[in-house]
Amino acid sequence: MKTRSLISLLYLLLCSCSSWLPPLEERTESRHFNTSKPILLDNILQIRHTPHKNGLSDIYLLNDPHEAFAARAALIESAEHSLDLQYYIWRNDISGRLLFNLIYLAAERGVRVRLLLDDNNTRGLDDLLLALDSHPNIEVRLFNPFVLRKWRALGYLTDFARLNRRMHNKSFTADNRATILGGRNIGDEYFKVRNDTVFADLDILATGSVVNEVSYDFDRYWASHSAYNATHIIRRGDIPHGLQELGYDDETARQALLRYRETIEQSPLYKKIQNRQIDWQSVQTRLISDDPDKGLDRDSRKPPIADRLQNALKQPEKNVYLVSPYFVPTKSGTQALAKLVQNGIGVTVLTNSLQATDVAAVHSGYAKYRKPLLHSGIKLYELQPNYAVPSTKDKGLTGSSVTSLHAKTFIVDGKRIFIGSFNLDPRSARLNTEMGVVIESPLIAGKMERTLAQTTPSYAYRVTLDKHNRLQWYDPATQKTYSNEPEAKLWKRIAAKILSLLPIEGLL
């Protein structure tokens, strides 16, 4: 009887969790910085287009992880008025802490900082986030936060519908003059701090029209019904400890940070910024972003992002190149791709192999569609783990020894390219909020398409069917053909097979 009563009491307590969310009326209103007066970033980045010039932006592709970090550091260090930062993941590791420190120093010199983080990956950051928020020029908000900070998983028992919807957006904007958006989160694996785990990813550094679009989009999310003040959610935190973390209290961590900073200062982009010689590409751009109400499953005034992305990329005439680390095409998506092939459109897909993926459940959702995709005539490639991709801007998606694919980019007819956070899976389409930019540029899209066509066969398995309709993986480096998932241990193959039997496709 006592056990039943305790269980009932625990359930009632858990059911009340969602009601513990603080009132949104306690938030202060703010909007992005806006001025036409010359500022430091205009000179540092040699900005040629104002944020209000319709559709025209200057972009610089960030395929190298060290350049990707250098760009972010440069924006923080050059900012005079505001920093608006929106991320799904911000890790408390070498790169994450270094950027946190630079942000704090920016606030010290008077820069207003708005930091919006999805709360799904902030475990262990509470002290540091409170320390940041304690600065009068920094405000931290959490998207769809967990009320229970220590026992977060319990929140899913009673608030699953809300907590299952995450903010997957990634943007990094300084003074409403320059922005970075694409696939990278903030963490060592995205910036090649160590060699054990490196993600092949892609961002753009941009000035011009797209910056204003990103700034207005950030304002929408900042004021959304899912964004809560961190101080109202984190009720127990140690601010002095968080300040110590910001100050590199650990000597080993401090030395690692200094070494990485030295590496960044040797990157080509860092030197280009110092010399005011960034080789910009002037292009037409269009921001594609979800309505933040998607985070609460509310009706949006905008069509789903997948529909708007398809409209922006337009109907293909010759070929489509799809790069998606998490690729779950679903039955309808597989049929749509097959129809393109039937109409004479070449379709190529690059995704992760089982051994390369960091989410085996997603791979299990994709695996069952491989045969239908291949039967329809789609070219299918799976990234090999631990393959050294060439380190120049003309080769591949990144310059590093890659352990996993994380870039999300789609190229249509060598004329239009999408770079952003959107994966070709049900979660991106229906559950998470996403964003990215469509770039109209035969020069950039065509070059990326040719580069992928030339280099992908050298670092990815070509998946085909043998004469008995069985899957096989061809490794061009060794000229070896595998009959099972290459390099994946038996237990991993079994786990993926079991996961494929579960009715979880809509969550992947």
Language-model regions, residue ranges each:
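Charged, low-complexity intrinsically disordered terminal segments
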Residues: C17-H168, A174-L508
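Bacterial N-terminal signal peptides that target proteins for export
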Residues: M1-L6
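Bacterial N-terminal signal peptides
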Residues: I7-S16
